[in-house]
Amino acid sequence: MLDHAARTVIMVVQQEWPGEVVSIGPQLPSVTNYLTAVKVREGWFVAKYSILGTSLLSILRGARGPWDRVEAAQRDYIQQPTAQLARERSQLRALAAHARRTEGSLRVPTVIAYQDGVLISTASSGSSLAGELVRGRTAPARLLTDVTAIATALHRDRFLTGELSDSYALAMPHTSIVATFTRKFTGAEASCYLDSLGTGWLGGSARTQLATSFQALREILHPLLRRLPAPVVIYGDLKPEHVLLEACGRQTWIDPGLQPANPAAELAKLLSRITLLLITSRPSLVRMDAVGAAMDLLVTSFVAGHPRPDGITALRRLLVLFLADWANYLASGLSVPPDVVLPLPPMLLAATGQAQSLLGLACEAAASLTIDPARAWGTVLAGTLDLATGQPG
């Protein structure tokens, strides 16, 4: 699989820059797509290749069949306008138009080419929001306020939906928090999937405990997820590592996943990944407290933006999506084969190592979700800080 992806990327890069001396770097960490850096003259680019729109981990597990069948299907897949990276190309162009229209501080990578399933875009510079939250000097509240302001402007852009509906760019419902949770934890194959999590990493009793925790989350979260309205277009993959900050104050957002969704999903994924970042990176106590306070301020502002009693409903929706994203992320890590050949994100590996504690915290928060969502958020925030400092929950 990886040899096929590498050969395809090299072929497309050479066709895009014939006669140029091109340097192609090693594979970059990702469980979703084949990623690599490309240098041409003095410029840097990123090449991305998707196999059947399915995560590389799923392909390696045989979820789409043996490799010869996958390779044959891939030849047809890359010609489809609904292919994942064909949609991403359209999304990047629509986001660039949004940035020009709003004259805000958002930038996105420039599309250079899309050929044979390979998307080439400009490489982006700047420090990541993840790094700034953990090690930076800027107040976390300011950082997160700036990010959410850009997201809000995106949600309110009534022209964006029209631009995207003219193509297949919004046809990405399978990447949403709700769709991912439904695919992983419900349906005919869910039981086998849950039973397989942790294979090669954990003993039988620990795996049974994990499956029980995931099942408990499914029973609470799935009925609530099914009732969520999806009235706006959201960025869809707003993670701390996908936001790059420039000294001038502008931000570059990479790896979009534009989709119709509840606006709470945007903040839910951002907060979910920040909590995992704190737990796995363990910044200084002062910085950790500042980030925790900034997250709490965001949630308070989010609730205050809804009239009573709608604020309680909005908070419940936010936390349902938050906990579902936690479950999705941990399940991905626990599904990694022990002999996997992929370079994996360090945070995924670190979070997987603490999966039992994280799932225990998620189940505790979920238990009070229906009755008292404010208490559930307090449980999440306090538990995050406890795990990040190595204290028992």
Residues of each region from the PLM?
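A glycine-centered beta->alpha junction motif in the catalytic cores
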Residues: 52-53, 57, 62-72, 117-139, ...
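Conserved NTP-binding catalytic cores of kinases and kinase-like/nucleotidyltransferase enzymes
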Residues: 1-117, 227-228, 246-248, 374-393
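Catalytic activation segment of kinase domains across protein kinase-like and atypical kinase folds
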Residues: 241-273
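Active-site activation/catalytic loop segments of kinase-like enzymes and analogous catalytic loops
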Residues: 264-307, 322-342
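Active-site catalytic-loop/activation-segment of kinase and kinase-like phosphoryl-transfer enzymes
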Residues: 166-223
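Helical subdomain adjoining the active site within ATP-dependent kinase catalytic cores
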Residues: 187, 305-393
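Catalytic-loop of the protein kinase fold
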Residues: 230-236, 240
